[in-house]
């Protein structure tokens, strides 16, 4: 499927998607054109789905980041998930087979904001039975 050079390209781009192809080429000992072709092939295979940025929530005034478990009535699972997608404070959303049916990454300005989000927004969605936020203390990786 992919070879060792492709894996290295992916590792480099995962750390910094803006790494110039010339720099990648030097690290791999191949031409910039070869890197360009490899990246294009990785995109066409769907291995690279897109490029993104990392945002520091604290710099935007969000002092709390949570991973929040949301449980629902089984028949309301997808409706609740669709509603959660609409909220700007939900930054990532996953269906889960673990302790909770839905897992959401939520940004909140402070404890009061988080309480408002949990009680008056998520908690009021029809079909939600339980909301369990876990505040992230430090991102390690």
From Swiss-Prot:
Pfam families: AsnC_trans_reg, HTH_24. It comes from the Archaea. Signal peptide: none annotated. InterPro entries: ArsR-like_HTH, AsnC-type_HTH_dom, Dimeric_a/b-barrel, HTH-LrpA_regulator, HTH-Siroheme_Decarb, Tscrpt_reg_AsnC-like, Tscrpt_reg_AsnC/Lrp_C, Tscrpt_reg_HTH_AsnC-type_CS. Residues 21-40 bind DNA. One of its GO terms (molecular function) is sequence-specific DNA binding. Keywords: DNA-binding, Repressor, Transcription, Transcription regulation. The keyword Magnesium does not apply. Residues 2-63 form the HTH asnC-type domain. Gene3D superfamilies: 3.30.70.920, Winged helix-like DNA-binding domain superfamily/Winged helix DNA-binding domain. Homooctamer; tetramer of dimers. Forms a homodimer mainly through interactions between the antiparallel beta-sheets of the C-terminal domain, and further interactions lead to octamer formation. DNA-binding protein that negatively regulates its own transcription. Interferes with RNA polymerase (RNAP) recruitment by inhibiting the association of RNAP with the TBP-TFB promoter complex. Binds to a 46-base pair sequence that overlaps the transcriptional start site of its own promoter. Consists of an N-terminal domain containing a helix-turn-helix (HtH) DNA-binding motif, and a C-terminal domain of mixed alpha/beta character reminiscent of a number of RNA- and DNA-binding domains. This is HTH-type transcriptional regulator LrpA. It comes from Pyrococcus furiosus (strain ATCC 43587 / DSM 3638 / JCM 8422 / Vc1). The gene is lrpA.
